[in-house]
């Protein structure tokens, strides 16, 4: 769910400790063993849902993104055991499996933006940059009284406004000199007993989240401005297992399973509609909204719950994502994908002399592809078989080839090269 509004910033507060994570280096945590998607599950007929396709509205999409998790938990509050680790494992796994088509993030690659008349498809390219545990007290409630005075709201001890959430994100960014720009997304998680209002003037039936009814919304994504730059942020209140936001399954055996489903909903929407000017349908529904609580086929189950996605070897129960190409909600991209390889000659290149790169690409029914080569000296090429001259020696550099078909499906090939 996107939120197309701005809010007034308030005074800043200090941020908590930042734990920087190199996603590719994190070992998988101990836990259940998960099977891979079966052929039947992978190639099952997509389930159609009502409504029109999402359409492009002229704004940017995310071709790559860096993700940060902020857990705002003052000393008098707490999260259940395993909640934070399940969330961080999810972000780590999504980053690890970048460029694959085996999970729902591969569905996003059919969408694109247009700059100066050039269409550029999304690449499933995510980096998990770190976790911030913020422990400063919550501010006094700025929400309408009925949120805390209602029967359901009596379980709430505080209600955070969107302006207060924005202030916290700015504080964390400033306190740790973190990056800005729409390629950076900050997910804010709050503990049990914390309500939230995303609109400046909510009504009793719309605009607020409370820990029991969880009505109005389960989470939202939006953007703010700090230091003259836009930043994406997502608000994810704690999901009670008795509330309507609960996903219904817990394959990892803790309450973090449900909020991970909600995070995936918002993350996919942020990729395709970061500023509210990207992809959504005639009713304003984004690719996650159109498939809310539509989960599709399970792959298998652990002793504590079913899972329908295996990402970096871990199982998750995640809602499906809308695919224009399939005209349905789907769990993963099941259409034909390009396969690619390349070689270079001479096999022992010398700097100052020409190196020829030759690629081979195939995909059933497709003959037109786009190519993007990146070389370890910073060079780039966009033809099928480029030549490149390395001005200096290179010790174990990386050459990357990304091949895209007309539908946004991609093949990625990486090879090392040493230039003497």
For the regions a language model picked out, list residue spans one by one.
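Bacterial N-terminal signal peptides that target proteins for export
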Residues: 4-18
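Bacterial N-terminal signal peptides
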Residues: 17-28
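N-terminal carbohydrate-binding/catalytic regions of secreted carbohydrate-active enzymes
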Residues: 38-149, 159
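Structural recognition of the beta-strand scaffold that forms the well-ordered cores
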Residues: 66-71, 100-101, 106, 113, ...
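Active-site-proximal segments of metallohydrolase catalytic domains
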Residues: 118-223
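Metalloprotease/metallohydrolase-associated module, dominated by Zn2+-dependent proteases
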Residues: 210-257, 273-338
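Extracellular/lumenal mature domains of secreted and surface-exposed proteins
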Residues: 324-420
């Amino acid at each position: 769910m996107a939120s197309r509004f701005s809010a007034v910033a308030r005074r800043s507060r200090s941020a908590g400790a930042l734990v920087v994570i190199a996603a590719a280096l994190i070992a998988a945590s101990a836990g259940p063993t998960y099977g891979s998607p079966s052929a039947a599950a992978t190639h099952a007929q997509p389930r159609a849902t009502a409504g029109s396709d999402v359409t492009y509205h002229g704004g940017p999409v995310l071709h790559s993104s860096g993700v940060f998790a902020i857990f705002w938990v003052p000393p008098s509050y707490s999260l259940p055991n395993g909640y934070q680790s399940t969330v961080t494992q999810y972000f780590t796994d999504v980053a690890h499996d970048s460029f694959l088509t085996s999970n729902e993030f591969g569905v996003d690659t059919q969408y694109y933006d247009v700059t100066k008349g050039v269409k550029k498809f999304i690449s499933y390219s995510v980096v998990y940059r770190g976790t911030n545990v913020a422990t400063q007290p919550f501010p006094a409630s700025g929400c309408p009284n009925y949120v805390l005075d209602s029967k359901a709201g009596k379980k709430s001890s505080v209600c955070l406004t969107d302006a207060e959430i924005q202030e916290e994100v700015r504080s964390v960014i400033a306190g740790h000199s973190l990056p800005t720009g729409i390629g950076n997304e900050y997910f804010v998680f709050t503990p049990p007993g914390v309500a939230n209002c995303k609109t400046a003037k909510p009504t009793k039936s719309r605009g607020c989240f409370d820990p029991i009814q969880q009505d109005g919304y389960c989470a939202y994504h939006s953007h703010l401005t700090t230091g003259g730059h836009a930043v994406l942020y997502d608000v994810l209140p704690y999901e009670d297992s008795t509330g309507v936001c609960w996903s219904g399954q817990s394959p990892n055996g803790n309450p973090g399973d449900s909020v991970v489903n909600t995070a995936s909903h918002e993350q996919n929407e942020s990729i395709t509609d970061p500023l509210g000017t990207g992809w959504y349908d005639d009713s304003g529904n984004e690719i996650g909204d159109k498939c809310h609580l539509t989960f599709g086929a399970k792959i298998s189950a652990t002793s504590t719950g079913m899972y329908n996605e295996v990402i970096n070897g871990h199982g998750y129960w995640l809602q499906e994502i809308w695919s224009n190409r399939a005209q349905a909600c789907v769990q993963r991209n099941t259409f034909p994908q390009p396969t690619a390889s390349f070689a270079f000659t001479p096999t022992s290149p010398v700097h100052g002399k020409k190196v020829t790169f030759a690629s081979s690409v195939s995909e059933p029914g497709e003959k037109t592809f786009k190519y993007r080569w990146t070389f370890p000296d910073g060079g780039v090429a966009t033809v099928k078989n480029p030549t490149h001259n390395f001005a200096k020696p290179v010790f174990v550099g990386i050459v990357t080839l990304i091949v895209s078909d007309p539908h946004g499906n991609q093949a990625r090939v990486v090879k090392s090269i040493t230039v003497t």
